[in-house]
Swiss-Prot record:
GTP binds at N203, V204, K214, D369. This is Phosphatidylinositol 5-phosphate 4-kinase type-2 beta. It comes from Homo sapiens. GO terms for biological process: 1-phosphatidyl-1D-myo-inositol 4,5-bisphosphate biosynthetic process; autophagosome-lysosome fusion; cell surface receptor signaling pathway; negative regulation of insulin receptor signaling pathway; phosphatidylinositol phosphate biosynthetic process; positive regulation of autophagosome assembly; regulation of autophagy. It is found in: Endoplasmic reticulum membrane; Cell membrane; Nucleus; Cytoplasm.
Length: 416
């Protein structure tokens, strides 16, 4: 599915429902049409582009099987925009989707409907996260918190192309039951001559259950503490030494531990075969009792400060922006969940603490950052760190086989 076209106007916009959706006494303002309104042009272009490509894909029959060319294919569009939505979209931009048929197939295998995916990315602007990856990587979540949008480098895009066929085959063989990132789309956006690459994945954390503490674990102990700057954040990302120094454990019980480690071992062996390393286990902890207390405080505050009328029908803009009108969308919460409860088909990385756990918790655990190959740079970094810290030190830049073995051992020790 390769196309290269120039358009003077943007794609037709779809009407939205004008119904009001309430969440915790907040009101939404519905847009009659998709305006792709965002705080910066790059996000408006992302919303426009995903809306356009999903609409285009809906007209392409689903093939019986993917062909080798699908793993090299792309669709791209150049827009000279002088008429449509000038307040929100740049006058000129380009949008490229990589391997559209492959990512559509992956979304299907991960149980994600294209319409839901489109709605999540395009209904309201993505939200900036205070998380920041290496080399200034930027993270956003969709307004409903279902998906994570991450800026990546052109080298990451090249590595994704290198592994995509084997990754897809692995997902087919494990029926989507994996701790690996669920890659759902990869795009290049060009605004004012600047190219930005973005990858969309399923959110490891829940759209509904608050994460109270999080860790990025590699199984290495050299220089693996959160910085003072990181610790000052509302939700810092702690690291291996922080985890160990706190005496932290994840209380999942024997059976859940066995199942989790089997899945982890299979996933990590796959990464070692691809000569990939430097990945992490992202861990989020939801404290059920604390969440209940916070919920009560929110409700008490909401009663004290009922939403003020804005003079146009009593609607207020809420932090989620435009509401969904699809009954299956997560913000409508069609099912009731008690404290610490979740839908395992949605929160696929979630695991409850064992009943013998000292605290009632929900853990979210997944492998992240799998686009680092063991290349010449990594070999050089390993040599330098070995000289500095000694051959026996638990440095992070070891070879992929050593890395996977150490990673598995560390994760086995933190689960109980």
């Amino acid at each position: 599915m390769s196309s290269n076209c120039t358009s003077t106007t943007a794609v037709a916009v779809a009407p939205l429902s004008a119904s009001k959706t309430k969440t915790k006494k907040k009101h939404f303002v519905c847009q009659k049409v998709k305006l792709f309104r965002a705080s910066e042009p790059i996000l408006s272009v992302l919303m426009w582009g995903v809306n356009h490509t999903i609409n285009e894909l809906s007209n392409v029959p689903v093939p019986v099987m993917l062909m080798p060319d699908d793993f090299k294919a792309y669709s791209k569009i150049k827009v000279d925009n002088h008429l449509f939505n000038k307040e929100n979209l740049p006058s000129r931009f380009k949008f490229k989707e990589y391997c559209p048929m492959v990512f559509r197939n992956l979304r299907e295998r991960f149980g994600i409907d294209d319409q839901d995916y489109q709605n999540s990315v395009t209904r309201s602007a993505p939200i900036n996260s205070d998380s920041q990856g290496r080399c200034g990587t930027r993270f956003l979540t969709t307004y409903d918190r279902r998906f994570v949008i991450k800026t990546v480098s052109s080298e990451d895009v090249a590595e994704m192309h290198n592994i995509l066929k084997k990754y897809h085959q692995f997902i087919v063989e494990c029926h989507g039951n994996t701790l690996l990132p669920q890659f759902l789309g990869m795009y290049r956006l060009t605004v004012d001559g600047v190219e930005t690459y973005m990858v969309v994945t399923r959110n490891v954390f829940s759209h509904r259950l608050t994460v109270h503490r999080k860790y990025d674990l590699k199984g290495s102990t050299v220089a693996r503490e959160a910085s003072d700057k990181e610790k000052a954040k509302d939700l810092p990302t702690f690291k291996d030494n922080d985890f160990l120094n706190e005496g932290q454990k994840l209380h999942v019980g024997e059976e859940s531990k066995k199942n989790f480690l089997e899945k982890l071992k299979r996933d990590v062996e796959f990464l070692a075969q691809l000569k990939i390393m430097d990945y992490s286990l992202l861990v989020g902890i939801h404290d059920v009792d604390r969440a209940e207390q916070e919920e009560m405080e929110v409700e008490e505050r909401a009663e004290d400060e009922e939403c003020e009328n804005d003079g146009v029908g009593g609607n207020l803009l809420c932090s989620y922006g435009t509401p969904p009108d699809s009954p299956g969308n997560l913000l409508s919460f069609p099912r009731f969940f008690g404290p610490g409860e979740f839908d395992p088909s949605v929160d696929v990385y979630a695991m409850k603490s064992h009943e013998s756990s000292p605290k009632k918790e929900v853990y979210f655990m997944a492998i992240i950052d799998i686009l680092t190959p063991y290349d010449t740079k990594k070999k050089a970094a390993h040599a330098a760190k070995t000289v500095k810290h000694g051959a026996g030190a638990e440095i992070s830049t070891v070879n992929p086989e050593q890395y996977s073995k150490r990673f598995n051992e560390f994760m086995s020790n933190i689960l109980t």
